[in-house]
Design a protein with these regions (language model features):
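Short beta-strand/loop segment that forms part of the nucleotide-sugar
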Residues: 32, 38-48, 66-67
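N-proximal low-complexity "stem/linker" segments adjacent to membrane-targeting elements
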Residues: 1-33
Length: 294
């Protein structure tokens, strides 16, 4: 999308895009080229040793730039969420794998009634140019496990392209950013935490088809085995918390857990596909370019 860029500043509510990054100086121009005009961009730098911050300031002069307080994607997102002031928060990656041009579709899903707009590479026309056979198999298994335990209908649990209303941050309840000591939730498991906790709260989740591209420059920090095990451990923690119905402390040994909310999850898909959950509400949303530009 090198021509017309959608201007979301002309609409309400206000939109903040949070972008965690570390050593992504070469990729940021591609991200900026496809970024719609939004009310606020929050750049979270993870101690980059290249020109990431300099390039970000040049591309987005008005961006809020913060340094994350620990390591890991989860901590970076928590720092970005804390700095965000928009009504809607959109989380994307800085490596070019998530397409900023899709942001209007996520925002539209929220303004049409969703609490969480969940990107999906495996339904509603979504696709991935990057996922390996091992990651696809692991994602499918983790999807099935979460859907059975929490009575949800996720098609793509581990994809990090999401948008949600900022008012739901207390439900997500990520670890505090005030300490430098490592916390459970600081890593790639953050995406599972967000999805499961919002589902457990009985909020409306709409899946939006998304195209994942290959990283443009550099190498991914994702490790399919170790990060997959962290996600599996997160699912078990949330399952135990659901049974106990109580909140634990934020620490590596005892993760922060939300209180249990007795409500059925509503997982809706924008294309009207079956979710596999009998009580789930299916919402159809028009995500054509003309519609999302309105």
């Amino acid at each position: 999308m090198t021509g017309t860029r959608v201007d979301l500043r002309k609409t309400t509510p206000r939109v903040t895009v949070v972008i965690p990054m570390r050593n992504e100086a070469l990729n940021l121009p591609y991200v900026a080229e496809r970024m719609p005009y939004v009310d606020e961009i929050v750049v979270v730098d993870g101690a980059s040793v290249d020109d990431t911050v300099t390039v970000a300031r040049r591309l987005w002069p008005d961006a809020v730039i913060v340094q994350q307080t620990r390591t890991g994607k989860g901590n970076a997102l928590a720092c970005g969420f804390a700095a965000a002031t928009g009504d809607i928060i959109v989380m994307i990656d800085a490596d070019g794998s998530t397409d900023p041009a899709e942001i209007p579709a996520f925002v539209r899903a929220l303004t049409e009634g969703a609490d969480l707009a969940k990107g999906s590479r495996f339904s509603l026309g979504g696709h991935s140019d990057d996922i390996t056979a091992l990651r696809r198999l692991g994602n499918k298994g983790l999807n099935g496990l979460v859907n059975r335990i929490f009575h949800t209908g996720f098609a793509d649990l581990c994809y990090g392209y999401n948008a949600f209303w900022r008012r739901h941050l207390p439900i997500i309840d990520l670890p505090s950013t005030d300490t430098t000591e490592a916390q459970w939730g600081d890593g790639f498991e953050v995406e599972t935490i967000i999805n499961v906790r919002m589902a457990r709260a009985g909020l409306t989740i709409t899946e939006v088809g998304s195209h994942e591209s290959r990283r443009i420059h550099g190498r991914s920090n994702l490790n399919a085995v170790s990060d997959g095990l962290r996600v599996l451990r997160t699912i078990d923690r949330e399952r135990r918390s659901r049974r106990a119905g109580q909140r634990g402390a934020h620490s590596e040994s005892d993760a922060a857990e939300p209180s249990d909310v007795a409500a059925d999850t509503v997982v809706a898909e924008t294309g009207g596909a079956e979710t596999g959950v009998p009580e789930a509400e299916v919402v159809e949303a028009d995500t054509t370019p003309a519609a999302v530009a309105r």
